[in-house]
Amino acid sequence: MGICSVVITTDEADPNARGTLAALAADPRWTLGDWRRGTLSAVLETSSVREDRRCLRWLDDQPGIVGVHLVFAHYGDDGEEGR
């Protein structure tokens, strides 16, 4: 299992940002913090590094998202940490 802590930067003027964040809130893999001034902290829990990367790439390509910044990543017992 992998756990990633990320900071998501949004374009507050883009109405699509709220839709993207609503999609994240509906996804049980994501735990979202407070959205303030276009910045949101979040935790992503996945079953693999591959799934983690796929989720982060998807998010980075969504409308209203300016950037996705990985703060910390840890992947279970396999010894792989960070990227």
How should these model regions be labeled?
Residues T46-R57, D77-R83:
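Short, low-order "capping/linker" segments at domain edges
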Residues E45, V71-A73:
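Short loop/turn motifs enriched for small/polar and acidic residues
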Residues G19-D27, R54-Q62:
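Short amphipathic alpha-helices in soluble, non-transmembrane regions
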Residues G38-E45:
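A generic structural motif
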